[in-house]
Amino acid sequence: MEDSTEDIIKSFTLEQSPEIKPKPKSKTSDLTDIVYAMDDDSIKMKKFTIFDDKYDQNISDSEHDLTPIKRKRQSAQSAPPPPATKFSSSIPQKPTLSPKKLATSPTKNYTDHINQLRSGPNSPKKYQDDENIRSLKYEIKRLKQEQNLKLENLQHKIDYLTNERDELQNQLTSMSFENDKLTKKNRSLSHENNHLTLENSKLKTKEYSNEELQSENNKLQRVNSTLRNERDELVKDFNITRDKLKKYYDLYLHCQKAHAKEMKKRIEVDGDKPISDKPMADNSTNQELVDVLKKLSEMMIEQKKISEPSAAVEKDTTSEDKTPPIPNTANSSDTPRMVSDFLEDFIKRVFEEMSSNNKNTLSPKQAINSQTYSQPNNFSNNTVPPSQSAAYNPSNSQPAPPPQPATNFYSSSTPNTNGYNQSSQSDERPETFELPHVAKDHWLQRPTSERSTQSTKYMKMDPEDIRKLVSVITDQLKKEQKSEKPSNVVEMETPVEKCQCCHGNPRNVTDTNNNQKLCQSCLNKGDFTMSEFMGRSN
C-alpha cells in the first residue's frame, strides 16, 4: 500500500513549468504577453482536470479519510503476486483497492463528499490551484524583470539616440553656415558670370575692330620696314658723300696750293713788267659789276634785318668763325676771274628762283632754298672760296679795301652748313665729316601773308639790272676764254674718259662747249680729276 500511495502522490505532483521561449518582437503592448501567459496556464489546467477525471473512479473514499485504516494481515495461504514481467517496472500499474467502509458514516451524497474532500486544505485540487496562483505570481515577476530590462535597454537606446541627435543637430547648424557661405559664393559667381558674359559679348562685337587694328598694325610694320630700308640706303649714301667730301676737300687744298705756286711763278717770270700790259677787264665793266653787287648787297641787308627777329637760323656753337685772310692782290688780272666765278654761281641761282617765281607758287623746299641763296656753299663749283672774292675791289689800279658788313655777303653770323669751318684755309683736313647741322626753319611757321610778301620782296629786282648783269657776265666769260695761258707754263694733257651716260664714247671733260656732265654712276665711283672739278662750272 505504501508503494501505491507513493505512486499516487508522485502522480499528483506538479510538473515544472517549461521555460518560456522568447516571443518575437512585436509592436503590441505588455498586456499581450500577459494574455499569452494566461493561455498557457489554461492549457495546463486542462491537463490536470483530465487527470482527475481519469483517476476519480478507481480511488475509494477511504483513502482520503484522515482516520487510520485497519488492514488485515495477509495469510500465508494467500496467493503470491503475479510474476513481474520485464516491462512491469516501467509501466505504472493502477492500485487494486477495494472500497472499504469507514468508521464514520458516509455522506448522504457522493458528490457532496467529493466536493468536501476537494475543498479541504490537503486536497490535490486546492494544491493545484495554489500552485497555479504561485506560478502566475512568479510569471508576473519574471515579466516585470524582463520589462525593466527592456526599459533599461530602451533608455540606453534613447540616450544614445539623443546624443546622436545632438551631434546631428550640431552638424546641421555647421552645414547651415556652410550652406549660407556657398549660397553667397554662388551669388558672387553668378554676378561674375554675368559680367563675363557681357564682356564676351563686347569682345565679340569688337572682333571686327580688332581685325582692322591688326591690319593697320601690319601696314605700319611694313611701312616701318620700308623706312628702315630707306634709312639704310640714306646712311650708305651719306657715307659715299662723306668720302666724296673728303676728296673734294683734298682737291680744294691741292688747288689752293697750286694756285699759290702759279702766282709765284707768274711774279718771278713777269718781273717788273707794268701791270697795264697784262690782260685786264675794262673799267666800265668793272664799275657796272660793282654797282650791281651793291644793289644785291643792299637787298640782302634788308632781308637780313627782316629775318633777324624770327631767329630763322641758329648759330653753330661748335664751329669757330674766323675772319678770312685777304688774298694777295699784286696781280689785278685775277680779280675779274674771281668775280666771274662767284657771279656765275650766283646768277644761276637767281635764274632758278626767277623761273620758280614765274609759276606763282613756292613749295616749302623752294622757300627754304630761297633763304640759303644768301648763304651759298663754300665749295659749290668754285675754285676759290667766295669769302675771298667778296673782299676784292674790281678796279684795276687800287687795291681792295678791308671788308665791310654792308658788302660782306658771307658774314660770320652765317651758320656753317658743310660740317667744317667754311673760312679756314689751312692745309689740315677736318677731323670729322658728319652730317651738317640743320637749323630749325622758322620761316615756314610764319603766316602765309608774311611769307609771300617777304619772298617777293627778296626776289623783287629790276629786269634791266638783271639783263645788264647777265650781259656783263657773258662778256667777262668770253674775255676769260680768249685770254691764253703764258708761254712758259706747260699745258697739261686733257684727260679723256669714258662714261656710261655717254654710251662708252670718249669725252673731253675740260671742253667748255661740251655740255656733257658726269652721270650718277660715275660720281658714285669717285672717278674725277682736278681738271674735271675745275670744269664743272661749265
Swiss-Prot record:
<keyword id="KW-0963">Cytoplasm</keyword>
<feature type="compositionally biased region" description="Polar residues">
    <location>
        <begin position="446"/>
        <end position="457"/>
    </location>
</feature>
<keyword id="KW-0175">Coiled coil</keyword>
<feature type="coiled-coil region">
    <location>
        <begin position="144"/>
        <end position="237"/>
    </location>
</feature>
<comment type="function">
    <text>Plays a role in mitotic spindle pole body organization, possibly at the point of spindle pole body separation. Required for mitotic exit.</text>
</comment>
<feature type="compositionally biased region" description="Polar residues">
    <location>
        <begin position="104"/>
        <end position="122"/>
    </location>
</feature>
<dbReference type="GO" id="GO:1905047">
    <property type="term" value="P:mitotic spindle pole body organization"/>
</dbReference>
<keyword id="KW-0206">Cytoskeleton</keyword>
<feature type="compositionally biased region" description="Basic and acidic residues">
    <location>
        <begin position="18"/>
        <end position="30"/>
    </location>
</feature>
<dbReference type="GO" id="GO:0044732">
    <property type="term" value="C:mitotic spindle pole body"/>
</dbReference>
<feature type="compositionally biased region" description="Polar residues">
    <location>
        <begin position="407"/>
        <end position="425"/>
    </location>
</feature>
<feature type="region of interest" description="Disordered">
    <location>
        <begin position="304"/>
        <end position="338"/>
    </location>
</feature>
<feature type="compositionally biased region" description="Basic and acidic residues">
    <location>
        <begin position="426"/>
        <end position="444"/>
    </location>
</feature>
<feature type="region of interest" description="Disordered">
    <location>
        <begin position="1"/>
        <end position="31"/>
    </location>
</feature>
<feature type="compositionally biased region" description="Polar residues">
    <location>
        <begin position="355"/>
        <end position="392"/>
    </location>
</feature>
<feature type="compositionally biased region" description="Basic and acidic residues">
    <location>
        <begin position="304"/>
        <end position="323"/>
    </location>
</feature>
<protein>
    <recommendedName>
        <fullName>Spindle pole body protein CSA6</fullName>
    </recommendedName>
</protein>
<dbReference type="GO" id="GO:0005737">
    <property type="term" value="C:cytoplasm"/>
</dbReference>
<feature type="compositionally biased region" description="Polar residues">
    <location>
        <begin position="86"/>
        <end position="96"/>
    </location>
</feature>
<feature type="region of interest" description="Disordered">
    <location>
        <begin position="355"/>
        <end position="458"/>
    </location>
</feature>
<feature type="region of interest" description="Disordered">
    <location>
        <begin position="57"/>
        <end position="129"/>
    </location>
</feature>
<feature type="compositionally biased region" description="Basic and acidic residues">
    <location>
        <begin position="57"/>
        <end position="68"/>
    </location>
</feature>
